């Protein structure tokens, strides 16, 4: 049985990564994210911290926040900001944060062994 397989990821279109780039959702408050995303309509913060596009009084766990994240994500795809790779791939990535480097691997994984 195959345990991992490649997949066709959604990634920023060529030349658009700088527009999409955003810090992890859990390192900024909603106010900081709102400020950082100001004037950056394609920042991924509009997905990962979608409350920044709603009234500041809304709870960040409100269903409206998740609906806004979905809508923003779909808009990024529809506008060609995020595009799906043509062929299935395995992905290696590296994150650097505050002097710490983490390297990861992304693939489709079977959960059958855990069922």
Question: PLM features: residue spans?
Answer:
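A cross-family signal for N-terminal binding/gating loops and helix N-caps
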Residues: 1-114
């Amino acid at each position: 049985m195959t345990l991992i397989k490649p997949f066709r990821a959604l990634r920023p279109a060529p030349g658009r990564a700088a527009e999409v780039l955003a810090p992890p959702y859990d390192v900024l408050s909603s106010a900081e994210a709102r400020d950082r995303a100001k004037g950056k309509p394609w920042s991924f913060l509009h997905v990962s911290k979608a409350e920044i596009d709603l009234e500041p009084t809304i709870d960040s766990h409100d269903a409206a926040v998740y609906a806004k994240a979905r809508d923003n994500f779909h808009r990024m795809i529809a506008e060609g900001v995020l595009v799906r790779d043509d062929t299935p791939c395995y992905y290696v990535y590296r994150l650097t944060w505050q002097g710490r480097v983490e390297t990861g691997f992304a693939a489709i994984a079977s959960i059958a062994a855990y069922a």
